[in-house]
Design a protein with these regions (language model features):
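Conserved glycine-rich FAD pyrophosphate-binding loop
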Residues: 1-151
């Protein structure tokens, strides 16, 4: 068996509620979960158990992991606690942050790495990526950053 270790944070007062939601997701995805966490600081590490030798289970585990991180955000937490974003959590960053907030991330990155040579494509999702995932919010019929090509 294989496992996927997630890393999200939640307000400590919502731990029981989040564990209940993770249990519901476990049933929905038909994958077992071993919940480990730092209860004192609200840092969760659900271990999603699956068999990579079974067609589709790896993708199913990844989808379940993304849903767990969405639950963390819904509960007032974040998509990452101590393990960072990298590429694994780029899509869930679109759930937690809006376009203006992501632009602040990019502004900081440009200030320190104007040539974009330090871990390009990692840590901050592009606005195009968020748009493709449905993470961009259209308000009053106005699309933010209309110059970005979309399909």
């Amino acid at each position: 068996p294989d496992y996927l270790c997630m890393d999200g944070t939640i307000p400590r007062a919502r731990l029981a509620e989040v564990l209940t939601r993770i249990d519901e997701l476990s049933s929905e995805f038909n994958l077992a979960v071993a919940n480990v966490f730092h209860a004192a600081d609200g840092n969760l590490h659900p271990l999603i158990l699956f068999d990579a030798n079974v067609d589709g289970q790896t993708e199913q585990a990844m989808a379940m992991g993304a849903r767990i991180l969405e639950v963390c955000v819904e509960m007032g937490g974040t998509v990452t606690g101590e393990h960072g974003v990298g590429v694994e959590k780029l899509d869930t960053m679109c759930v937690q942050f809006n376009a203006a907030e992501l632009e602040q991330f990019f502004a900081s990155k440009r200030a320190m790495d104007s040539a974009d040579i330090l871990n390009p494509g990692k840590g901050i999702p592009t606005l195009t990526r968020c748009g493709e995932l449905g993470g961009l919010h259209v308000h009053g019929g106005h699309l933010t950053f209309p110059e970005i090509e979309r399909f």
